[in-house]
Amino acid sequence: MKINEFIKNNLKVKVLNEDPSMRHIMTSTRLPHIVCTDGFTMSVQVGYSLYSEPKKVAKRYSKVEIGYPSERESLLEEYVELSIFDERFVDYTDTIYPYVPVKLVDKVLKKHGGIDLTETLRKAA
C-alpha cells in the first residue's frame, strides 16, 4: 500500500469551526502511527498546521510530515529537522522530517516490507 492510499483510508478529520470561511484552517487531522512488517515505525501526518503539501484535507498529497521513526533511516536523512546541542550526538529518531516527498515515503515503506495494516490499526485502537 502506498502512502496516499493509507492517508485516504485512515485520515481522521475533526472540524473545529463550522464557518465555511474558516473550515479549511480550523481542522484537526490525525493518522495512526505506521508499523511496517519488519517492525520499523514512523508517524506520517498531513494537514493545515503540519509540514505537508497541500496544507488542507486533500485526496492526494505531494509531501508529508514524518516524525519519530523507530530507527535512523538513511533515505530520510536529507529532510531531518535537527536541533544539535552537542555535535557528537545527533538523534534521528526524536525529531521530525518536514515536507518529505510521497515517492520517497513509498520507498521507505517498501524497504521495510510495507505497512503492517493489522498491527498499525491495532496499536491505534
Give short role names for the model-derived ranges.
Residues H24-M26, S70, D116-L117:
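Polar low-complexity intrinsically disordered regions enriched in Ser/Thr and small residues
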Residues E5-R23:
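Surface-exposed intrinsically disordered loops and tails
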Residues I34, I66-Y68, V105:
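Generic structural hydrophobic/aromatic packing signal, biased to beta-strands
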Residues G47-R88:
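Acidic, aromatic-enriched beta-alpha/helix-loop junctions
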Residues D19-S62:
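Amphipathic, interaction-prone secondary-structure segments
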Residues M1-K2:
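Glycine-rich short-loop/terminal segments
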Residues E73-A125:
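Low-complexity intrinsically disordered segments
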